[in-house]
């Protein structure tokens, strides 16, 4: 039996195994109920977001949750060969209906598979399915009829021998004559109109029928311009580009060592690589710590403004440097994240664009210490255990210890009483250490003893230094080796023999 922590409290569970984990990613976010309405609006109305707050409070989880509420992509982006100017390929955008219709047309061009008995008798005989002696149907790979024992291909041999005699030729190999025809072309009348029909043997058991429409479609496919699908229809709606390089973010054109030679090399359209801004088309582009790509913020601003961005070769020494694909779509929801101290380093026009077409949200670092929020911590523990997949569930008493630790950290780090910390990434480390201890102990659940050790041990190196040395300065002093201590006072070099030098 699962307990919904949105309606029940911690006293209703024995272990985190009893906790029901929500399917909606937005309901998995802990402690940000005040900004949740704006997050849902951003998903529905396609608004940009700037999430501000310290690391580990759920910014990336919020961005992923937005993508969960977006509809499936409806457009596919294709780069098409330009025969007049190969270094300027075209962009082709197809919606889902056009692609589905195209797939149906291709399937029609591939023909219809029928049973040999459904084909005309003359066709079935020439393709090797029907015996001309008794009319029995069998595999085209069987030259001897299994019913009458006659040679199914005797008429084919006689016809080929007759043609060979007329042309003054002789048989080089009798074995090759025993193979039936692969394809038979004939005509049929439908609605008073005569049309060409081709029957093709598929293996030894089926026949493919290509009518006039299928043949016409095949011809169109052959004549169609070569293309390269760079953003497929079936794709993820969440693209993370944290710390991306210029090439990863904006796209590139791969180098061709043969310089695009028509015979040896590859055409420019084949070497076009989309950037993260193009892959996020109709989805979410998430960049955490946006100040780390300060030089690329202006490109993101341009892409948000125009909803298109060209793909060019970015290496001047590459054969792709002369290739450019204009107006490649990139209509995405931008979700940026940063710390409070980094706000000053965000490009002002980019922030203006976000404010004009979205929202800037300051996220909480604590939540009130209520029964409902304590139950949310239990939900968080269950989610972390499921996400990890290598540790057992926790007893309710162990969860109570973690809640007490969350209360202590809210006071120590954020100086807030009667609150629980939302710096949940650090708490996740405590849960994993407790789970690892339970695994090593052979315990089916995380017990209080495991959680107590994890709370004591899963602390930062800085806290460990203070705990051991009382101050950071003393730690630095103790960290010096004996030779380093001596070097600070210098060496007496008056009586050193350097004659060997």
Curated annotation (Swiss-Prot):
* Enzymatic class: hydrolase
Pfam families, sorted? Mg_chelatase (PF01078)
Which residues bind ATP per the record? Answer: 53-60
Q: What UniProt keywords apply to this chain's record, in alphabetical order? A: ATP-binding, Hydrolase, Nucleotide-binding, Protease, Serine protease
Q: Does the keyword ATP-binding apply?
A: yes
User: Which residue ranges are recorded for the region named Disordered?
Assistant: 481-501
Q: Name one GO biological process term.
A: proteolysis
Read off the InterPro entries from this record: AAA+_ATPase (IPR003593), CbbQ/NirQ/NorQ/GpvN (IPR050764), Mg_chelatse_chII-like_cat_dom (IPR000523), P-loop_NTPase (IPR027417)
Write one Gene Ontology MF term: serine-type peptidase activity
**Stretches with biased composition (Polar residues):** 481-494
Which superkingdom does the taxonomy of this entry point to? Archaea
EC number(s) given by UniProt: 3.4.21.-
The record's comment on protein family reads: Belongs to the peptidase S16 family.
The name this protein carries in UniProt is: Putative lon protease homolog
Organism of origin:
Methanothermobacter thermautotrophicus (strain ATCC 29096 / DSM 1053 / JCM 10044 / NBRC 100330 / Delta H) (Methanobacterium thermoautotrophicum)
């Amino acid at each position: 039996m699962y307990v919904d922590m949105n309606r029940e409290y911690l006293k209703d569970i024995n272990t985190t195994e009893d906790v029901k984990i929500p399917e909606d990613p937005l309901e998995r976010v802990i402690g940000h109920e005040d900004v949740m309405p704006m997050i849902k609006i951003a998903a529905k109305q396609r608004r940009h977001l700037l999430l501000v707050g310290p690391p580990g409070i759920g910014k990336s989880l919020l961005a992923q949750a937005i993508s969960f509420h977006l509809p499936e992509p409806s457009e596919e982006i294709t780069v098409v060969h330009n025969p007049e100017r190969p270094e300027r390929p075209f962009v082709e955008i197809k919606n889902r209906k056009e692609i589905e219709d195209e797939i149906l047309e291709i399937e029609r061009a591939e023909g219809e598979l029928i049973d040999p008995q459904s084909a005309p008798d003359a066709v079935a005989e020439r393709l090797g399915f029907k015996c001309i002696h008794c009319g029995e149907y069998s595999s085209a790979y069987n030259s001897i009829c299994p019913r009458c024992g006659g040679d199914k291909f005797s008429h084919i041999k006689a016809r080929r021998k007759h043609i060979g005699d007329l042309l003054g030729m002789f048989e080089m190999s009798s074995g090759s004559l025993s193979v039936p025809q692969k394809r038979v072309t004939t005509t049929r009348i439908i609605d008073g109109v005569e049309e060409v029909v081709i029957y093709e043997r598929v293996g030894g058991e089926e026949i493919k029928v290509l009518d006039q429409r299928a043949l016409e479609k095949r011809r169109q496919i052959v004549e169609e311009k070569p293309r390269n699908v760079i953003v497929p229809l079936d794709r993820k709606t969440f693209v993370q580009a944290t710390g991306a390089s210029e090439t990863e973010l904006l796209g590139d054109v791969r180098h061709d060592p043969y310089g695009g030679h028509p015979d040896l090399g590859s055409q420019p359209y084949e070497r076009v690589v989309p950037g993260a801004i193009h892959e996020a088309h109709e989805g979410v582009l998430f960049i955490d710590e946006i100040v780390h790509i300060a030089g690329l913020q202006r490109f993101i601003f341009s892409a948000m403004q125009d909803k298109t961005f060209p793909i060019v070769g970015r290496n001047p020494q590459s054969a792709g440097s002369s290739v450019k694909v204009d107006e490649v779509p990139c209509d995405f929801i931008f979700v940026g994240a940063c710390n409070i101290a980094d706000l000053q380093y965000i490009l002002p026009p980019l922030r203006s664009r976000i404010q004009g077409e979205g929202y800037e949200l300051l996220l909480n670092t604590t939540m009130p210490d209520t029964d409902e929020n304590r139950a949310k911590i239990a939900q968080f523990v269950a989610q972390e255990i499921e996400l990890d997949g290598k540790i057992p569930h926790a007893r309710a008493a162990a969860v109570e210890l973690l809640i007490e630790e969350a209360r202590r950290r809210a006071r120590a780090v954020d100086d807030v009483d009667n609150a629980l910390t939302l710096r949940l990434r650090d708490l996740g480390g405590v849960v994993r250490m407790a789970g690892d201890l339970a695994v090593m102990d052979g315990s089916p659940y995380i017990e209080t003893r495991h959680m107590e050790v994890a709370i004591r041990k899963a602390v930062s190196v800085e806290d460990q230094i203070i705990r051991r040395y009382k101050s950071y300065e003393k730690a630095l002093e103790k960290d010096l080796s004996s030779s380093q201590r001596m070097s600070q006072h210098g060496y007496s070099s008056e009586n050193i023999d350097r004659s060997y030098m």
